[in-house]
Amino acid sequence: MLGVDEIIQTIKMIQEENLDIRTITMGVSLLDCAASDPVAVCDKVHRKVTRLAGRLVEIGNEIEREYGIPIVNKRIAVTPVALIIGEMGRDGCLALARTLDRAAAEVGVNFIGGYSTLVHKGFTRGDRELIASLPEALAATERVCASVNVATSKAGINMDAVRLMGAVIKETAARTADRSAIGCAKLVVFANAPEDNPFMAGAFHGVGEPECVINVGVSGPGVVKNAVARLPDADLGALAEEIKKTAFKITRMGELVGRETAKRLGVPFGIVDLSLAPTPAVGDSVAEIIEALGVEACGAPGTTAALALLNDAVKKGGAMASSRVGGLSGAFIPVSEDAGMIRAVAAGALGLDKLEAMTAVCSVGIDMVALPGDTSAETIAALIADEITIGVVNHKTTAVRLIPVPGKRAGEFVEFGGLLGRTPIMEVNHFGAAKFVHRGGRIPAPISSLNN
């Protein structure tokens, strides 16, 4: 039984510490929407998405009112569309992107993910058409999010895809230059992409998933920070225990909301993603947890160790609370979406090199990082390759969301608005790797991949 003090503590988490459900994401399979006629594909996709997700926002709002738990976003993830486009060509891909955007608007969700492809071992014709369409699709739509999986720990790294994505990111930035290159904020490059991730912009509905499913992403950096702050003299082992207990409570709440949403919609419940997802709001920062643990500023020596402690404790606490843990499940460090990280970059405490080191021990990777507008496509590709390699070698998901902002230089600020926040432009090493990137081919999988 819950004690009165635990109930009061949970209410305080919601009212004072920014605890919320970050997203309820409905996964929808589009595999039965394939057809030889692009018009027929778009029609099938539109009808299926609007039919299955038509009540998602309504049900989410109902649960929010009944339980008093804020649910920030309701979203949709679909099958990677490269699997259904067949011979549609680039124009067909763009028509499908507009169809997804229209369907998302009609059901009232703010993002729909799955304009995606998996090319870790090579390209089909459809993969190439979809990747070529990305800059225009992301510029022409408001709600569509895209992702490209360029590597796995079993297959190695497709460097041809990495090189291509460097150029795609540059073109996407140019096409949305009047909106601070916002198109790049909706594009993720993955290694070991999960099939059940509820968070945008990298969500898609994997081929091993059911026809329709509800996945939930929780939040709560502010709750964890306050838990740490209540123990100013505790050793690190005691702090890890306190973080585990806090993560347990957060995860239980997420599972409650996920199961109730799935029940009311008549679809299966999938997973709870344990990720601590920050926002630009004061007191809702992963960087501030690191600082509460005793690191003077996020990025200072000790940051990577503190982040590893946090990430591990969150996973252990969450795994005790639910048998349905999935997605990314760790601590997110998106620079523009975390008030503490924004301050650390502006103060010179946190740079790209340290950020890359941090990604080796936490969830996702180099995320929402704004770069100078004159950063070359080859340098962007090399940054992607470095980050993707961390994921491949360590058998974990890593991802890259880089935003080269046209006309901006290192140290200047860029505003994205909303949950995407604002950030200083980060300085990039002025030495290049163009020859390495243009060699192409595939970087073989590590020997640790041979584990059967």
UniProtKB/Swiss-Prot annotation:
CDD domains: RNR_PFL_like_DUF711. InterPro entries: UPF0210. Signal peptide: none annotated. It comes from the Bacteria. Homodimer. Belongs to the UPF0210 family. NCBIfam families: PRK05313.1 (NF003700). This is UPF0210 protein Daud_1353. It comes from Desulforudis audaxviator (strain MP104C).
